[in-house]
């Protein structure tokens, strides 16, 4: 999928609400759901459990625009929350939010990390720390990216990658509260520190020997 793509979800308005009605829907292979939005009445809907679960497993359901076809009428929305049964993992309820395609929205976009095993700092024994696996951005609904890439190849021990280091399109703005947060870093491990300490006396001895040789030659 690319910018501007949508995920189609077919749904029907449900007249009845409540625990009993929701239980009956689930028994029939349906998911009770709701769509809400600013200055709009909430709409209670139901959708196919099998179809939606498949989309959850194969598509970026939280970071892509949803085309809700409610009894044949198209509405655009974002998936805001998915509730699942703690044991079976079955989807028990979904919250959608109406989207105005003419206005910018905030959305969480997953980060894809490249070259984790080839990372310069990791190859030298450092520990890779991933601090954020998604990024809250503001953009037009039709410009939501499926994901954002973070290349770790040249990340050295003691260094980090900040949000400002990411190459974001001009049509996209970071909407996180924290100013320029760290996305990933590589820290020195105990083994790396020990290696440094083990090498220090040898370097010191070499330096001392060189100094003594200079004194002798004077």
UniProtKB/Swiss-Prot annotation:
Keyword RNA-binding on this protein?
A: yes
Compositional bias, Low complexity, is annotated for 202-218
In residue numbers, the region (Disordered) covers 187-218
The record, for Pfam families, names: Ribosomal_L25p (PF01386), Ribosomal_TL5_C (PF14693)
**Cited InterPro entries:** Rbsml_bL25/Gln-tRNA_synth_N (IPR020056), Ribosomal_bL25/Gln-tRNA_synth (IPR011035), Ribosomal_bL25_b-dom (IPR020057), Ribosomal_bL25_C (IPR037121), Ribosomal_bL25_long (IPR001021), Ribosomal_L25_dom (IPR029751), Ribosomal_uL5_bac-type (IPR020930)
Name the Gene Ontology molecular function terms of this record: 5S rRNA binding; structural constituent of ribosome
Choose any GO biological process term that the UniProt entry carries and state it.
translation
A GO cellular component term found in this entry reads: cytosolic large ribosomal subunit
Alphabetical UniProt keywords: Ribonucleoprotein, Ribosomal protein, RNA-binding, rRNA-binding
PANTHER family, from UniProt? RIBOSOMAL PROTEIN L25/GLN-TRNA SYNTHETASE, ANTI-CODON-BINDING DOMAIN-CONTAINING PROTEIN, RIBOSOMAL PROTEIN L25_GLN-TRNA SYNTHETASE, ANTI-CODON-BINDING DOMAIN-CONTAINING PROTEIN
Instruction: Name the protein family.
Output: Belongs to the bacterial ribosomal protein bL25 family. CTC subfamily.
The record describes its quaternary structure and partners as: Part of the 50S ribosomal subunit; part of the 5S rRNA/L5/L18/L25 subcomplex. Contacts the 5S rRNA. Binds to the 5S rRNA independently of L5 and L18.
What role is this protein assigned?
This is one of the proteins that binds to the 5S RNA in the ribosome where it forms part of the central protuberance.
- Put simply, this protein is called Large ribosomal subunit protein bL25
Q: Which organism is it from?
A: Anaplasma marginale (strain St. Maries)
Gene name per UniProt: rplY
């Amino acid at each position: 999928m690319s910018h501007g793509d949508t995920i189609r979800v077919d749904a029907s308005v449900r007249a009845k609400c409540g625990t009993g009605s929701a239980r009956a829907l689930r028994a029939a292979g349906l998911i009770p759901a709701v769509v809400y939005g600013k200055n709009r009445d909430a709409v209670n809907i139901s959708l196919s459990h099998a179809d939606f679960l498949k989309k959850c497993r194969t598509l970026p359901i939280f970071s892509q625009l949803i085309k809700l076809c409610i009894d044949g009428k198209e509405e655009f929305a974002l998936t805001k929350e998915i509730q699942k049964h703690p044991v079976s993992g079955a989807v028990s309820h979904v919250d959608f939010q109406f989207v105005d395609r003419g206005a910018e929205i905030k959305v969480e976009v997953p980060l894809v990390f490249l070259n984790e095993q080839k990372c310069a700092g990791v190859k030298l024994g450092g520990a890779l720390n991933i601090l954020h696996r998604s990024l809250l951005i503001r953009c037009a609904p039709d410009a939501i990216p499926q994901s954002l890439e973070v290349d770790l190849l040249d990340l050295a021990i003691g260094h980090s990658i900040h949000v400002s280091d990411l190459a974001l399109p001009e049509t996209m703005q970071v909407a996180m509260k924290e100013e320029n947060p760290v996305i990933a870093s590589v820290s020195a491990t105990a083994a790396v520190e020990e290696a440094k300490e083990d090498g220090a006396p040898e370097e010191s001895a070499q330096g001392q020997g060189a100094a003594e040789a200079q004194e002798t030659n004077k």
